[in-house]
Swiss-Prot record:
Official protein name in the record: ATP synthase gamma chain
InterPro entries (alphabetical): ATP_synth_F1_ATPase_gsu, ATP_synth_F1_gsu, ATP_synth_F1_gsu_CS
Species name: Desulfotalea psychrophila (strain LSv54 / DSM 12343)
Assembly behavior: F-type ATPases have 2 components, CF(1) - the catalytic core - and CF(0) - the membrane proton channel. CF(1) has five subunits: alpha(3), beta(3), gamma(1), delta(1), epsilon(1). CF(0) has three main subunits: a, b and c.
Species lineage: Bacteria, Pseudomonadati, Thermodesulfobacteriota, Desulfobulbia, Desulfobulbales
Keywords on record: ATP synthesis, Cell inner membrane, Cell membrane, CF(1), Hydrogen ion transport, Ion transport, Membrane, Transport
Amino acid sequence: MPSLKEVKTKITGVKKTSQITKAMNMVAASRLRGAQDKMESFRPYASKFSEAMSNLSGGGNTNAFPLMDVRDVKTVELIVVTSDRGLCGSFNANVVKLTEKKMAQYRAEGKKVSLICIGKKGYQLLRKSGAVRENYSDIMAHFSINNAREIASDVADNFLKGTADKVEIIYGAFKSVAVQAPVAEDLLPIQPVVSSEPAGEQTMSGDYIYEPSSEEIMDAMQPLYLNVLVYHAMLEVGASEHAARMTAMDNATTACRDIVSNLTIVYNKARQAAVTNELMDIVGGAEALK
């Protein structure tokens, strides 16, 4: 049985750890509110933008738009979005696990795979794969639309040059405070929807009337499309990271309380044993004096 001093030292150490995890939980909860507000305010814009792009692409000649060029897929580029910091449970590991699954799948089909890593943790876990083409670390703490624009421009240039035939983005989507799920979404080529309206009609859905023409608007919107999708994924990861960290720190705090409780029982037993031994020594000494 450990000594009283050893057990007491362990209890003190675990209590200090509990204070740290509790503070980190509170910080994560505070940051989550801001990140969640930004994400939820951007979601409707991203959704409508994607819907408009799909409707526009479904109503014209897709061959006129380079970002819709569907060709034989020989090289796939995966954009992997993770956090820069850890201590958020299995959040980053789940995104990397999905990425590795996708890489194995495409390589089994004889396709080359390259990676763009956004976030330090993803890069640290994937750099040994030898597939990382570009790395954007240390931007997730204070990212902006300018970061998304830079990344989107790089991806578009790579696609237009024919270096990549297909582009997907993989990130941890925010479902709720308790649930963050890794998802993979196609970015390029832009997928058109099949329109049921007669050719030449300007209205692609009940929500839109395009003037002067859908082709001209599509040409103007294309450079913005990837910006929106990449920025949206980064916002989702920003909120998911804080939610995952809040949950992880809450679990850690609970675990610390359980450990302290168990150590306290051990301490009390050790103390009781020590007192019993002392009493036995006293009684034994008294008997010896008789």
